[in-house]
């Protein structure tokens, strides 16, 4: 179902209007409380700047960390307000609380084009309970609603879902619109062949995604720690590699399902082993049927990289979610880096490359290739749920186009 977006609202619609914008500002901080990666703040700028240009009064709502419904001084949005002020080139006023007299006074004092950042909504337990009274208090600050927090769209919270019952219009921001366009588009109407690369350490966290992707894709490539559950299910010995014993039957079923559907399901043919889980462990590369006892697999090997590159060469759409190995250790990052480089090359040849959230985004950024990809998703859980074909409450609640 297509959703109405901010693009459909003109300056005449928005001038002097108070617009509540849900953003995803859940950024990492270092021990000194400084922001170490402002990607999520920058991702919201197109929506914020568009609203400023159209003369709206911009009221930003965000969560930060998990304060569990209580005020936590270390989880205030003060560093975010400071960084956003720098990026916008204008002062962003932060409130003491997201609802109540201070928020009301600061919103009432706004002029057209001003930006106010409401304090962490999760300081109130009512936020995650999607409490209607709390949602109404948030909504009372504004005349219209924009949801640009794709990363929180899979949660039915007061600021992502509840407020839409009290604000009209309720529309998708530019980032949300782009996320839906790419991720939904890749699933519903992709240019084919469509391939998915799924990595990460556990099959259990990707079951729904793997099942959905086997239904929709022409090729599914699997890497990361989860491959050892598949190998063990095939009867291979995996040394002391990570295995989910309770998922062996599922691994067999997934392979059988792919075969029955004529989907190419590719697993690595060789792996890079370590004698210990550490950056300077001893390592060796072996075929998957020759893993010795006492060793664990921490990356895919060079033959597997070639196999995966060949499989991807003719693809028109590629979705990547999850690293191929323990890329945080340089010695075991070759597989992940090779996939990042391959996708960057494919993008240059007109392939639509989508990096679906989480660790793969970090890997692509670490390799300096983020700009080369068609789309980098800002959602972790939200991306996975959308790829699984689930309805995201924060999206469903918006006005239909």
UniProtKB/Swiss-Prot annotation:
Return the EC number.
Answer: 2.7.2.3
Q: Which keywords are on file for this protein?
A: ATP-binding, Cytoplasm, Glycolysis, Kinase, Nucleotide-binding, Transferase
Q: What class of enzyme is it?
A: transferase
Q: Which GO terms describe its molecular function?
A: ADP binding; ATP binding; phosphoglycerate kinase activity
**Superkingdom assignment:** Bacteria
Coiled coil stretches, renumbered: none
> Where is this protein found?
Cytoplasm
Q: In which pathway does it act?
A: Carbohydrate degradation; glycolysis; pyruvate from D-glyceraldehyde 3-phosphate: step 2/5
The GO annotation for biological process reads:
gluconeogenesis; glycolytic process
Specify which residues bind substrate according to the UniProt entry for this protein. Answer: 24-26, 40, 63-66, 122, 155
Q: Which PROSITE patterns match?
A: PGLYCERATE_KINASE
Residue positions annotated to bind ATP are: 206, 297, 328, 357-360
What's a GO cellular component annotated to this UniProt protein?
cytosol
Q: What catalytic activity is recorded?
A: (2R)-3-phosphoglycerate + ATP = (2R)-3-phospho-glyceroyl phosphate + ADP
| Family to which the UniProt record says this protein belongs | Belongs to the phosphoglycerate kinase family.
Q: What interactions and quaternary structure are annotated?
A: Monomer.
Family matches, as HAMAP family: Phosphoglyc_kinase
Q: What is this protein called?
A: Phosphoglycerate kinase
